[in-house]
Amino acid sequence: MEKRESSGGSGSGDAEVRKGPWTMEEDLILINYIANHGEGVWNSLAKSAGLKRTGKSCRLRWLNYLRPDVRRGNITPEEQLTIMELHAKWGNRWSKIAKHLPGRTDNEIKNFWRTKIQKYIIKSGETTTVGSQSSEFINHHATTSHVMNDTQETMDMYSPTTSYQHASNINQQLNYGNYVPESGSIMMPLSVDQSEQNYWSVDDLWPMNIYNGN
C-alpha cells in the first residue's frame, strides 16, 4: 500500500513524499522529463517534474529500471565469469564492476552475486580457484538447461509487448491499480539522445515489474 510522509512544519501538500511502488504514470512523467531536460540535480528534478518522490528515489528508478541503455534479459555465462573474476579482484565494489558490464546496473550485479554465485560457492564448500569455481558454476547451471531462467525471482525486469490487452492485464497483476491509459494516448521517448519525435507508446513498453522501494 502506498504511503505518504510529510516533512512537517508547513502543512503544505508539496511537503508530502510518496513511498512504495512506482506507478506507470510516474514512470512516464520521469522518462519524458529527463528526455526533455536531462538528469540534472535529482532533488530539483523530482520537484520540477511534479513527482512527490525523493531525489534518491527518482535517481534509483531511472538508473536501475528506466534508463534506455539498461540491458534486459538473463546474465550470460560470459558475464558470470566476468563478475566472478572482478569480484575476486575488487570485492563488493559493485559500481566499479558494473562499468565492465555495459548495460548492467550495480544493483543487478550485486543481487546476482548474492543470490546465485555466492550461494553456490558456499554450498559447494570448496576452496578452489576463481577460475575453477567459475567453470563449475557455469557448467552446473548450463546442464540444467536454464542458465539463468530463475534470476527473474530476484531481479526486477520488464520486456516490451505489442499487445495492449496483455499490457492491461499485467497492469492489474503488478498492482498499478486502476490506472490504465488509453492505447497510444501517452507516448514515451525512445532515447534521451534522439529526436523528441521518436517515442514509445505504452503498448511497446509495458508490462514492467515495479520497483518496491525508494
Swiss-Prot record:
Coiled coil: none annotated. One of its GO terms (biological process) is jasmonic acid mediated signaling pathway. Disruption phenotype: No visible phenotype. Myb24 and myb57 double mutant has petals that grew to a final height parallel to the pistil. Myb21 and myb24 double mutant is partially sterile and has petals that just grew out of the sepals but ended at a lower level than the stigma. Myb21, myb24 and myb57 triple mutant has a strongly reduced fertility and an arrested growth of the petals that never grew out of the sepals. Myb24 and myb108 double mutant has a reduced fertility and a greatly reduced seed set. One of its GO terms (cellular component) is nucleus. Transmembrane segments: none annotated. One of its GO terms (molecular function) is promoter-specific chromatin binding. Residues 42-66, 94-117 bind DNA. The keyword Chloroplast does not apply. Residues 14-66, 67-121 form the HTH myb-type domain. It is found in: Nucleus. It holds the Pfam family Myb_DNA-binding. SMART domains: SANT. Interacts (via N-terminus) with TIFY10A/JAZ1, TIFY5A/JAZ8 AND TIFY3A/JAZ11. This is Transcription factor MYB24. It comes from Arabidopsis thaliana. The lineage of its organism: Eukaryota, Viridiplantae, Streptophyta, Embryophyta, Tracheophyta.
